Amino acid sequence: MHNLAIALHNGKHQVTGSDDQIFEPSRSRLLAKGLLPPFDGWEASRIDSQLDAIILGMHARKDNPELLRAQELGLNIFSYPEFLFEISKEMTRVVIAGSHGKTTTTAMVLHVMHHAGVPTNYMV
């Protein structure tokens, strides 16, 4: 999730987050971008109607106080894969799958796209 937070931040979106624990290297990377939460854990008061969306980590429990508050406020709530789909649904997508060679194939495709002058984004 921290890579998504950093990517959104780099895209000029206002980003906040929370988790029960944040480990290295995520902690240092978030700190360097000014995105490290001020404390570990969840607090319902951090969720208000000004938020555009909530993106849940895969370990978020149904009784998470921030999730409950977001539901109470009727906020848009996405899982990580749902959010990735939402932001890319109008884009042409290339999916590379298989047992071996996915990262290498992805790098080759990106290299070709870059040299062809085609703007691209990627997710590995």
Segments and roles (model prediction):
Residues 20-21, 42, 82-83:
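Short, ordered loop/turn segments at secondary-structure junctions
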